[in-house]
Every structure is written in C-alpha cells, then in structure tokens.
Amino acid sequence: MRGVVFLHAFPYSPRMWEGEVALLKTRLPVLAPHYLGLSLGKAAEKVLGEMDEAGLEQAVFVGLSMGGYLVFELFRKAPERFLGTVLSSTRAGPDSEEAKRNRYALRERVLKEGVGFLPEALLPSHLGRTTQATKPEVVEKARAIILEASPEAVAETLVALAE
C-alpha cells in the first residue's frame, strides 16, 4: 500500500497537519506520527513502525522544518520506502555552532520556565506577517499546539536537533 506521511515541525505535533490529513484520508492512506522528544534515529524507527502497522509499504514524505530533518534520517535508514518527498523550511546540513548554542540556551530556558514563552518567541518566525495579521485562527492553533508540548519533550528535541 502507498500513502502520505506528514512530519511535523518543532515544537508542534501532528495536529498541525489536521487539515491536510482530513482532505487526503478519504483518498489514500495518511499518517502523521508524533515524535516530539525523540532523537531523529528513534523518531525514524517510530515512523517506520507506524508505517508497518498501517501496512504502508511506501509513501511520499512531507517534512516541515524538523520534519525535513526526519525525512533525511528516514531516507538514510529506508530509501526503499520512498515514493517522493516534499520539503519545506528545512535543511540537509548540520546546525552552525551559533545555532547549536542557541538551541542549548533555549533548552535551558524551557527547563527553567516551561513552554509558556515559546509562542511569542517562535511564532514571528514560524508564521508570515500576512498570516499573523489576517488569520487569527491559524495563529491561535499554532499557539495552542506549542503550549500542549511538555517542557521535557521540547528540551530533548532541542538536543536532538543540535546534534
């Protein structure tokens, strides 16, 4: 069986793909796994396991930001599972030293303060100005998804992204 696998951005969850999943699930198999808090290796194993459970032999992988990092990890582990990829706002190379320092600093702040500050810190760079100005429902959904994340999962993911 063939389908689509949606891979969410940091620090979101599969809820970010609800509209896309709802649109496609009547036409083909769709997965949107949750992996916040896992290393990329563990996340790839989880995705492949969910694909196996669903009987999904191959897929088009859609990765946004951190989801794109995971697409590359999946391709290293199981290239035969790929029909194609859609990558957005991601990169194939490692973080710069400055980016790594910023991730570790953000990790420390999350562990100290929780996730309450993250929407204001991240949404300006995650959503375009037009979306922020004209689509309050999108902004609110993104804010809510971020606030649902556990500080521990966010902190662990920041380490995974830095390494």
What are the residue ranges of the model-derived segments?
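Active-site acidic short loop of glycosyltransferases
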Residues: M1, T26, G55-Q58, P79-E80
